[in-house]
Amino acid sequence: MRLTKTLLISAVLLMSATGMQAAGFNQNGNYLTVQLKQHQNFGPSQIRLQVVSDKIIRVQATAEQSFRNKQSLIIVPQNSKAKYKVEEQGDNLIITTAAMRAVMNEATGQITFYDLKDNVLLNEVAQGGKTFKPFTVPDREIGVDIAKVPEAQKHGWSWRALFNSPDNEAFYGLGQHQSEELNMKGKNEDLFQYNTKVSVPFVISNKNYGILWDSYSYCRWGNPEDYLQLNRAFKLYDKDGKEGQLTGTYVDKNGKKIVRGEDSIYFEYAMPEASEICNKTDKGGIQNLPKGFALNGSKVVYEGYVEAPTNSFYQFILYYAGYMKIYIDGKLVVPERWRTAWNPNSYKFETPIKKGVKTPIRIEWQPDGDVSYCGLRVAAPRSEAEKNQLSIWSEMSPDMDYYFIAGQNLDEVISGYRTLTGKASLYPKWTLGFWQSRERYQSSKDIEDNMKKFRDLHIPVDNIVQDWNYWKLDSWGSHEFEAARYPNPQAMLDSVHAMNGRFMISVWPKFYDTVKNYKELDSKGWMYHQAIKDDIHDWLGFRGSFYDAYSDGARKMFWRQMDENLYTKYKFGIDAWWMDASEPNVRDCTPMWYRKALSGPTALGTSTEYFNAYSIVNADAIYNGQRSVNPNQRVFLLTRSGFAGEQRYSTATWSGDIATRWEDMRAQMTAGLNYSMAGLPFWGMDQGGFCVENRYVAAQQEFDKTGKENADLKEWRELQARWNQFGCFVPLYRTHGQWPTREVWNIAPADHPAYKTIVAYDKLRYRLMPYLYSMAGMVHFKDYTMMRGLVMDFNGDDNVYDIKDQWMFGPALMACPIGEYQKYSRNVYLPKQKGWYDFYTGKHYAGGQTIVADAPFDKIPVFVPEGSILPVGPEMEWSDQKKAELIDLYVYAGKDGSYTLYEDEGTNYNYEKGKYAMIDFKYNDAQKTVTIAARKGAFDGMLQKRRFNIVLVSDNNQQGISLAKAPKGKMVKYAGKAVTVKLK
């Protein structure tokens, strides 16, 4: 290679250098900017590269004459010390770091990333890898306060980044979505925030890289175009074969029938009747259902034929509330699904349809409420080559801005993501215990009585949660307890704490317009006004709106109001904050354009540009607010939405108001895995589901009257049992839902197998506390991921890339839940890199095979890989009831292994000052020795002496983990000095 220009540059030198002009690029500080020699239509005019570290390169592109320098909401300040080399050869600009190389064609702008062995990691397509279209925000999306928006903020760019991707590539991340998809290769995903849907602009590849794009608008992964109405994608025929539309048959509960033609199935939203802007600009949604037809209890069928323009696997998206089934070509392509009427769900599916053939279609819908929703759309067909590409589209940004992150493995890639967006906080230890929640405790007596019952029954629990409406009915946003139901909140908090419990409270960014806090925020221009203008009343009958969390002043005021009414007022007795509806969800079931009008304009720009990032700025308000008034108590937030960078604000996300259905349970497995692999480490769900089918409600009511367990109640109890077993192996172990309430004694009697297994897994969770809290330490100090798709630990085994219902929970436990009713065994794939042990029995299996694992009612399969070291602590009823003076240390033979036990004070920030301890363990399989290293570090209250009962699990010593009996092992006394133990 003949080099025409070579520069050895360190970031320190770059910072002092300005305006250096090379043959094809300009170097200013640590930026390398290229003015493209061939400016293609809709392409960039300039590209700017920044070496952030050896493994991270930032790519910016603009279609304008210069870059707009916006302040990032997700990237923390970077102090790069990376050294790199810049070369030019012909039209190529080459940047080489200690870990990788980026090559940009200065004529076309195409960028290719290589490792140092010249293997391509990722490359943009040669033509059209970066495209732009000018974008102007429609007036209706800005809404009533359009006069506040400067003209420049109304204009930006829609952009698309397009990359080649080999057939054997797999993609993960993008946040939490509900279609039971894990590997996103060839899939489409609309990226926006919604109750049960959390979108994160970060994706990782099994090729050991990730892409983080710095955009806050609505985005699309995969197909950059919107889904089509059925009549735009197909020729439609009614059930009699007449061209033009499908047949819609509506039969109400009294037998009244309406039959009409339907050229599309798009009844996906409702509009407020008093909204002038809606009435003028949007005639769609449920207002196009038959006039006067009573949906509740009805049955609706859409049927006929579709004729496709080309042979393809067509990618559909179903939007549904109530019960839904879909048949295409005589096949059941969507088995029955259900969602409550006020919170519809989206579900994606694919099916082949042949060109030019009238293919039968039948959609069966049973609405479940007076208002309900239904929609079916389809993506325009694309070739397999197009589907296989990596495509990212952003609706509105000032420019294209993405970070390429390389690593030796996916942990390193996620570490790079956290280098950019901030380290994860170390959560309070008690958050890893069991949380009891419901919608909702109605009084302080409810709270205290239920906490006391846990203690009386000796069932482990750490946290009890107060959901919404603890305030007076007409005072949402006051943050004040209603005195009649909560006469002495301080006494309630003191009582919970005296029982060694913790207390979390729900706070929404929502305010009725009559409360003092609304008026104070509004006086500064910090409330969204569209909902007030349109006279939107919530389900309780009152009018209100949300505050503008994008304003620094608004965030400080919001926290001050919380502090004055809840936190300092009650002597810091509230342990955690439940930040609900942080999408923000001003009104359910509205079209996207109106959601934007309801949640803007923001202090930073239009809500179109800042549509997805509300939750991170809202989390900023609470995290920094609490630390400003009580700097040494760990903050913890639970939020219904999330975004890149939120981990730095001690925030966990739960998956929203999901349904109590087996398919929803299964969907949470992939939802949690992809959320975790999007770099956000702490996730949970409403164990047991939130929204309850009427059949389960009726079954519980019958049991309460008669004591009889009918078929529906039997299924309900098994669903709750399986979901709680599943929940034991996710970061946040929390039950929550609507009636029937979810305290274990309300799910089933104490002699019922559902009760017994729920309590057993609760106790197991607490026995695993040394393992769990050490994982939390790894998350903070080593950028670890707790809930891990198998690709993270067994990349290279092609069989793991699409496994949706198995994962590693930390380094030692592979959870394999049951997601179907009356299923008492399941296939389990054991990755080939290691052998495996049954967690309960110690039986050994070779890797690289699929086995049929027993899964009786009271257990789900769990397996442990060879080389694992698993600490198991004492039985406890709350997380810090006992210090782990005796730890059963299970060591699994077959591979060398290592593990680090992490401990600190658990609730404060002294770990930031170095007050913590780590003990390293190493297992040598050939010698059958365990070396316990000298303890590193110290903290107040640390155990100076302890015991380890070291249990070697092997083919010859099959020992499982049991709550009933202590394992046989070798007892070692440890006082902080290194010791090596021979196990055989």
Predicted regions and their residues:
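Extended extracellular/luminal ectodomain segments enriched in beta-structured repeat modules
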Residues: E307-Q315, Q927
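Solvent-exposed beta-strand/loop surfaces of large extracellular or lumenal domains
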Residues: N69-K85, I328-K348, H529-Q530, D534, ...
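Extended carbohydrate-recognition surfaces in non-catalytic/accessory domains of CAZymes
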Residues: R232-T310, D399-L426, P753
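Aromatic- and carboxylate-enriched substrate-binding clefts and catalytic-loop regions
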Residues: E64, P134, Y347-F349, Q366-V371, ...
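Catalytic core of carbohydrate-active enzymes
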Residues: Y623-V635, G642-W654, Y675-M685, F690-T929, ...
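Catalytic and substrate-binding clefts that recognize carbohydrates or anionic sugar/phosphate headgroups
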Residues: E88-G241, G255, Y314-L318, Y323, ...
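Bacterial Sec-dependent N-terminal signal peptides
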Residues: M1-N26
